[in-house]
Regions:
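Intrinsically disordered, low-complexity serine/threonine-rich segments
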Residues: 3, 13, 27-34
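N-terminal glycine-rich anion-binding loops that anchor highly charged ligand groups
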Residues: 62-64, 70-116, 126-133, 352-353
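Glycine-rich anion-binding loops and their surrounding alpha/beta cores
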Residues: 63-67, 71, 77-78, 126-129, ...
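Active-site cofactor/substrate anionic-group-binding motifs, chiefly glycine-
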Residues: 111-170
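Active-site-proximal loop->helix
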Residues: 176-192
Length: 401
């Protein structure tokens, strides 16, 4: 076997076993060995002696993507422009799965920076299908997910309550990756039709006061990274990009993150991206929502910068609860909780919905403080407005099936 053929067989083996190779990097205790392993991957798929003519259907690693990976392997963070180019090449289908996995793994090993988030978000925003709403000053409650606590879908319930309180909402979201239920899962379980065109979503927002921006339908370029994300089964930078890439360009955001460090990173990125106003919250350094146990860390984003504060259940005027009071096994259970709360059920599930809906209303400048936002959220539930809006959303979307 000639040298070129031998190297091509090495490449095919790496491509066929890319998942195993990349995942094996995480078992290493040495950052040096991680870098060495990834260098081997890069050499095998893009080494100077490799003849791409042996496999003409395979796109050659682009200069920007290769440079980005090599910079990360040396422990350096990427500029906004370089990250923008690298993610753009991935989302334009100009990279292989092994190359994508190499970039995502290198980012994860070193930890994503603010500039990297900003550059990636800009590339993703440019390729998103926009929602042509007439309504302005929209709110989004999309969080990062991935807290693995298996609570019911609090952020989606909070979006419905905020909309029932009069705040227009463009809820961005997807199906579950690591939790029991994602926003798409629970809305589908409630009976909402997710398969709407961008014009229908805009009409839903303008008419009902809330619409769901189903990420796979509006971020078509993500299809190139999706198989790699699924095979890796770990958190990557794409988990952080959902809250930064609302297709309706929401002016206000309530963003949940499962770690305080991630919350601060997102807050700084939102500020750099020019977000009008956002609250980025992390409950007790484990929940990607406002929590009613421990302390919720809140990063307030405005044009002036980012400020940090903390909330507790007692400061919100609500009873504390345990995570066990909020856990579900599937989307059907999550939907049942929302229906029960909207029908008047009291207890921890209602309280945490009130807390998060109040935070959403505060983020949208509908209240002066979290304490004054609490009764607004509670009234939207207690008067039956949340239940009626939920049924209207279901009916409206089904009529456009």
């Amino acid at each position: 076997m000639c040298g070129v053929e031998h190297r091509f067989q090495i490449y095919k083996a790496i491509l066929a076993n890319g998942e195993r190779l990349v995942l094996s990097l995480f078992s290493s205790q040495s950052g040096h060995s991680v870098r060495r392993s990834l260098h081997k991957v890069l050499y095998a798929i893009d080494g100077p002696a490799f003849d791409a003519s042996c496999h003409p259907q395979r796109p050659i690693m682009t200069d920007k993507l290769r440079l980005a990976i090599l910079e990360l392997l040396e422990g350096r963070s990427l500029s906004v422009d370089l990250m923008h180019s690298a993610i753009g090449e991935i989302m334009d289908g100009r990279s292989t799965e092994v190359e994508i996995a190499s970039l995502l793994t290198a980012l994860r090993c070193r930890g994503e920076s603010v500039n990297e988030l900003v550059g990636a978000a800009q590339a993703m925003r440019e390729r998103a299908t926009s929602i042509p709403c007439r309504t302005i000053n929209l709110l989004d409650t999309c969080g990062t997910g991935g807290d693995s606590l298996h609570t019911f879908n609090i952020s989606t319930g909070a979006a419905l309550v905020a909309a029932a309180a009069g705040q227009p909402v463009a809820k961005h979201g997807n199906r579950s990756v690591s939790s029991s239920t994602g926003s798409a899962d629970v809305l589908e379980a409630l009976g909402v039709n997710l398969q709407l065109t961008p014009n229908h979503i805009a009409n839903c927002i303008d008419t009902v006061g809330i619409g769901f921006c189903f990420a796979p339908l509006l971020h078509g370029a993500m299809k190139y990274a999706a198989p790699v994300r699924k095979q890796l089964g770990i958190r990557t930078i794409f988990n952080l990009l959902g809250p930064l890439t609302n297709p309706a360009q929401a002016s206000f955001q309530l963003v949940g993150a499962s770690r305080v460090s991630s919350a601060e990173l997102l807050a700084q990125a939102l500020h750099k991206l020019g977000t009008q106003r956002a609250l980025v919250v992390c409950g007790n350094d484990e929940l990607d929502e406002v929590s009613l146990w421990g302390v919720t860390t809140v990063f307030e984003v405005s044009c002036e910068g980012v400020q940090c504060q903390t909330w507790t259940a007692s400061e919100l005027g609500l009873d504390p609860c345990r995570v066990e009071d909020l856990q579900v096994s599937n989307a059907a259970e999550s939907a049942a909780i929302l229906r029960n709360v909207f029908a008047g059920a009291k207890g921890p599930t209602r309280d945490i919905l009130v807390a998060n809906a109040a935070a959403a209303l505060l983020a949208a400048n509908r209240a002066e403080s979290i304490r004054t936002a609490i009764p607004l959220a509670a009234a939207a539930i207690d008067t039956g407005r949340a239940a009626r809006l939920c049924e209207w959303l279901i009916k409206f979307t089904r009529e456009r099936a």
